[in-house]
């Protein structure tokens, strides 16, 4: 009799995806982030669902409903902070996952990579809308500033902004629709993740060497399931430490003040995971130029397959490109720091230089370095 996991129509799909899946024998801990992102997504959906049971999407009661969750609901504080800090963990893992893809040349799987970039956009949109829901000062003003950027679009901009707002300012209609979108998007993201995996399993995983590993494959279970569980335990430890010891470490104190349209906070800034893009936006004095640079700072990921000029796939054996990539990482950390600083000297200049370097490293230096390495290796 055939094993049920190999014959049952539904279980067969799970078997081919997570149990009998042939995986390269040499994938390192950098390949753990995919499963960690999946766990993060599940955690966010579960905690979000419980929060939605007590939250009210109305400008008069939104702030107090969040307070009520933290004070009166059984373990409401834990659910709320696990959700907020879970989002931070999500982005940490996302950035590691993308960095791994760039380092090891995983972007040569075009379909998987492009779906991944679309996933990044969807997660960013979800996180932005979620930040608006507590209806604190930074929620309100963040929503006002970011949605206002669309008014830079020629001709249709101002109408588009009012259409998104559902009125002439960020108000009740905006909050209600943001809650609706924040609720539905994670399920759309889940569907996109399935497509992401579908395309990945068409080609099989990349390996640190960047070479074809068809000659040496091992079953995903038990080798990589146990490895993923270890990663999940580390993640659970980090998230619990953050949630139980310093839940507000990554938040903004301004968001503990109820939204007030008549009082602007001194420094409007998004959550830490958007600061690098926010710094790029602010570094350009022109509004439309800033919006385009903001979009391009993430859309540039789509260009990686076209900019790959090296004869080798991975950076494992390319020390010069490795140095450049780590310079890019340092540059992104500088951009993140600048995004959280006020718009005054010397931060303006540092932000402009870091933004120029960001685009130069990716568009000019990395392809040039690849060609140079080809020459050095006489290829």
UniProtKB/Swiss-Prot annotation:
Heme b b562 binds at residues 83, 182. InterPro entries: Cyt_b/b6_C, Cyt_b/b6_C_sf, Cyt_b/b6_N, Cytb/b6-like_sf, Cytochrome_b, Cytochrome_b_C_euk/bac, Cytochrome_b_N_euk/bac, Di-haem_cyt_TM. Heme b b566 binds at residues 97, 196. The keyword Membrane applies. Its main location: mitochondrion. Pfam families: Cytochrom_B_C, Cytochrome_B. The chain crosses the membrane at residues 33-53, 77-98, 113-133, 178-198, 226-246, 288-308, 320-340, 347-367. It is found in: Mitochondrion inner membrane. One of its GO terms (biological process) is mitochondrial electron transport, ubiquinol to cytochrome c. It comes from the Eukaryota. Keywords: Electron transport, Heme, Iron, Membrane, Metal-binding, Mitochondrion, Mitochondrion inner membrane, Respiratory chain, Transmembrane, Transmembrane helix, Transport, Ubiquinone. Binds 2 heme b groups non-covalently. Belongs to the cytochrome b family. Component of the ubiquinol-cytochrome c reductase complex (complex III or cytochrome b-c1 complex) that is part of the mitochondrial respiratory chain. The b-c1 complex mediates electron transfer from ubiquinol to cytochrome c. Contributes to the generation of a proton gradient across the mitochondrial membrane that is then used for ATP synthesis. The cytochrome bc1 complex contains 11 subunits: 3 respiratory subunits (MT-CYB, CYC1 and UQCRFS1), 2 core proteins (UQCRC1 and UQCRC2) and 6 low-molecular weight proteins (UQCRH/QCR6, UQCRB/QCR7, UQCRQ/QCR8, UQCR10/QCR9, UQCR11/QCR10 and a cleavage product of UQCRFS1). This cytochrome bc1 complex then forms a dimer. This is Cytochrome b. It comes from Dactylomys dactylinus.
């Amino acid at each position: 009799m055939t094993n049920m996991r190999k014959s049952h129509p539904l279980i067969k799909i799970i078997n081919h995806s997570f149990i009998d899946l042939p995986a390269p024998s040499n994938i390192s801990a950098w390949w753990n982030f995919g499963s960690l992102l999946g766990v993060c997504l599940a955690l966010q959906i579960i905690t979000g669902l419980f929060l939605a049971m007590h939250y009210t999407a109305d400008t008069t009661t939104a702030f107090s409903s969040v307070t009520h969750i933290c004070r009166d609901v059984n373990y409401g504080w834990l659910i709320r902070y696990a959700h907020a800090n879970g989002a931070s963990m999500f982005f940490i893992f996302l950035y590691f996952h993308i960095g791994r893809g760039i380092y090891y040349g995983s972007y040569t799987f075009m379909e998987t990579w492009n779906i991944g970039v679309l996933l990044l956009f969807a997660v960013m949109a979800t996180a932005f809308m979620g930040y608006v829901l507590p209806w604190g000062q930074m929620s309100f003003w963040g929503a006002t500033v970011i949605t206002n950027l669309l008014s830079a679009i020629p001709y249709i901009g101002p109408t588009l902004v009012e259409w998104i707002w559902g009125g002439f300012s960020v108000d009740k209609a905006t909050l209600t629709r943001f809650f609706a979108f924040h609720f539905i998007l994670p399920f759309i993201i889940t569907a996109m993740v399935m497509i992401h995996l579908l395309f990945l399993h068409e080609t099989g995983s990349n390996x640190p060497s960047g070479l074809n590993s068809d000659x040496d494959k091992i079953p995903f279970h038990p080798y990589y399931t146990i490895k993923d569980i270890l990663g999940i335990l580390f993640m659970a430890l980090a998230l619990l430490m953050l949630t139980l010891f310093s839940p507000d470490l990554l938040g903004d104190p301004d968001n503990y003040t109820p939204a007030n349209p008549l009082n602007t906070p001194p420094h409007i800034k998004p959550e830490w995971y958007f600061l690098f893009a926010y710094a790029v936006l602010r570094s350009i004095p022109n509004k439309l130029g800033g919006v385009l640079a903001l979009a391009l700072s993430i859309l540039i990921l789509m260009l990686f397959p076209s900019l790959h000029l090296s004869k080798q796939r991975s950076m494992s054996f390319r020390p010069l490109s490795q140095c450049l990539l780590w310079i890019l990482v340092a540059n992104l950390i500088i951009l993140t720091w600048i995004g959280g600083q006020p718009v005054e000297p010397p931060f303006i200049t540092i932000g402009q230089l870091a933004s120029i370097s960001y685009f130069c490293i990716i568009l000019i230096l990395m392809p040039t370095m690849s060609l140079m390495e080809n020459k050095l290796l006489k290829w």
